[in-house]
A protein has these predicted regions:
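Short beta-strand to alpha-helix junction loop
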Residues: 58-69, 93-102, 139-158, 168, ...
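C-terminal lid/capping helical subdomain adjacent to the catalytic/cofactor pocket in oxidative enzymes
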Residues: 2, 26, 45, 325-378
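Glycine-rich FAD pyrophosphate-binding loop
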Residues: 24-46
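N-terminal Rossmann-like FAD-binding beta1-loop-alpha1 element of flavoenzymes
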Residues: 5-32
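Active-site substrate-recognition segment that forms the wall
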Residues: 22, 51, 82-86, 193-199, ...
Length: 378
């Protein structure tokens, strides 16, 4: 017989933990089911660790709204919970005249999205702020920052557990089924179990589609396609030549190889983008020459041999090569017909920045579902 649990959050990445925290703090009984033996082992720990301002995303999109709201909430949260972070700022640069129009579009979109403090920089200001950067124009985003993503997840988990949530590691959801009075999840691992949940949040990153397909009663047509995109990061040996993050104008279907700086002062370049057909974190060192070429467009002082292989990360894409990047997909009963179920698809960047706002959004959807079930909403 299945054990009854009010709410299960599947996936203990940064978004899943934020959702679990939010639900537990609202008084719900929450269990977090994580397939791996630790939390946050995939996209949540294999990224740039950037707090994004909300510059690039289309007007009115979930990415735009949740990134801006999430950033403001995240800075407050970090200050209140002593999560290491630094509002370091970012300079977006046009490397030549052909990129000026793109730079202008970024600035216009960011202004529409409500990003504060943006400022076009004169050539002299650019030289003073970042003397090692070569460009023809740029603007400053002072709201952009960097963060200790592991520390953030620890804080979210601590909040959730202090409000009664439980984290079950090495507990993969292997199948499930929709019943009239809830959703039954079959959980594997060393001690398999069945749990019946009134609410389920599927926040499993690039596994979200597989989890959804494993639950009988979720319409297959509601599940978007799965695509994997790997990104490589190289680190820079020696002292940091930059004081801020440096992002070139994108020339392809991602933001390009940019400069990030971690809280220890280490400079990282990346990510690039390569489409793969399965999850494989191996580092492809043959991409080194392309990195040197891309970086020297805005940092001509990069010396041969200065780049060292860093790490890779895989983004949970719901679009393929040559297709426009879609919005976050956050589905509830209106999309798939299952009461109490929220599926999160394609929660890549700016997912970390947006995590608190995503959690609020999911909680609101579940509150509506709960009210409908109780008959208070027609």
């Amino acid at each position: 017989m299945a054990e009854r649990i009010e709410c299960a959050v599947i996936g203990a990445g940064v978004v899943g933990l934020a959702v679990a925290r939010r639900l537990a703090m609202s008084g719900r009984e929450v269990v977090v089911l994580e397939a791996e033996e630790a939390f946050g082992t995939h996209a949540s720990s294999r990224n740039s660790e950037v707090i994004h301002a909300g510059i690039y995303y289309p007007t009115g999109s979930l990415k735009a709204r949740l990134c801006v709201a999430g950033r403001l909430a995240l800075y407050r949260y970090c200050a209140e919970h002593d999560v290491r972070h630094h509002r370091i700022g970012k300079v977006i640069v046009a490397c030549d005249e052909t990129e000026l129009a793109g730079l202008g579009k970024y600035l216009e979109q960011a202004t529409i999205n409500g990003v504060e403090g943006l400022r076009m920089l004169t050539t002299r200001e650019l030289e003073e702020l970042e003397p090692e950067v070569r460009c023809v124009a740029g603007f400053l985003s002072p709201a952009t920052g960097i963060i200790d993503s592991h520390g953030l997840m620890l804080a979210y988990l601590g909040d959730a557990e202090s409000h009664g949530a439980a984290l079950a590691l090495a507990s993969p959801v292997v199948s499930g089924r929709v019943e009239d009075d809830g959703i039954v999840l079959e959980v594997g691992g060393a001690e398999p179990m069945s749990i019946k949940c009134g609410m389920v949040v599927n926040s499993t990153g690039f596994n979200a589609q597989a989890v959804a397909r494993s639950i009988a009663g979720i319409p297959p047509q509601s599940v978007p396609p799965t695509h994997y995109a790997i990104g490589h990061y190289y680190t820079l040996s020696g002292a940091a030549p930059f004081r801020r993050l440096i992002y070139p104008v994108a020339r392809q279907d991602w933001l390009g190889v940019h400069v990030t700086i971690d809280l220890g002062g280490r400079v990282k370049f990346g990510p690039d983008l390569a489409w793969i057909d399965r999850v494989d974190y191996r580092f492809d060192e043959s991409r080194e020459a392309a990195f040197y070429h891309a970086i020297r467009r805005y940092y001509p002082g990069l010396k041969d041999g200065a780049l060292q292989p860093g790490y890779t990360g895989i983004r949970p894409k719901i679009h393929g090569p040559g297709q426009p990047a879609p919005d976050f997909v956050i589905q509830d009963q209106r999309d798939h017909g299952v009461a109490g179920l929220v599926n999160l698809y394609g929660i890549e960047s700016p997912g970390l920045t947006s995590s608190l706002a995503v959690a609020d959004h999911v909680a609101a959807l579940l509150e509506v579902a709960s009210s409908r079930r109780e008959g208070s909403v027609p």
